[in-house]
Amino acid sequence: MQGQWQFDTLYHKVPPFSFTSQTGASFSQKELQGKVFVANFFYTSCQGICKQVSTQLARVHDAFRLQPDVRLVSFTVNPEQDQVPQLKEYSDSFRADPSRWIFLTGPKPQIQALAAQGFKLPVVAAAGDSAELELHKQLMLVDKQKRIRGIYDGTSAKEIDRLITEINVLLSEYETDHGK
């Protein structure tokens, strides 16, 4: 087409969601309108990989603490255990600003569907034939149009450095391209 920019990359879009945050308030994707966000899946009683990933996410949180267009969104994969008090305690342990780093819980089937269809993470059958989200260390960078723009190893300091750089690049693109 003449005179129109054409993109050669197709990004997967994250579907709408609505869950309960660590403050007890309802939180939906609508509240991320105009925001870049980093998503991950975890559970509060996980002592291994989840703590490593959350510690690295705390670096991202601190790097963008004053940036109004960046959020972190952590979805529990164990909503039966991770209710509002547990999410609040967990978020407090990382000194998370609840307006910037949102921890979410909700019905397990909805969280599993969001992980599997929304973020394209594998859901595997666990003992007892119940579908469980296989925990992954990936962090997903999602742009203002809700497109997944990158996947990062949440246990790697080097990958977190790359994530921070790519968030800054994305924000710079918005300032340049969209006259923000």
Predicted regions and their residues:
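N-terminal targeting signals for export/organelle localization
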Residues: M1-P16, G179-K180
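Short, small/polar residue-rich loop motifs at catalytic or cofactor-binding pockets
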Residues: H12-V14, V36, E134-H136
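Hydrophobic beta-strand positions
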Residues: S18-F19, L141
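Short active-site neighborhood of thiol/selenol oxidoreductases, capturing the structured segment around
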Residues: F27-L57, L72-V73
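Thiol-based oxidoreductase modules, predominantly thioredoxin-like and allied folds used
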Residues: P68-Q83, S99-I111
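Short, internal strand/loop/helix patches
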Residues: K88-H136
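Thiol-/selenol-based redox modules, centered on thioredoxin-like
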Residues: A127-K180
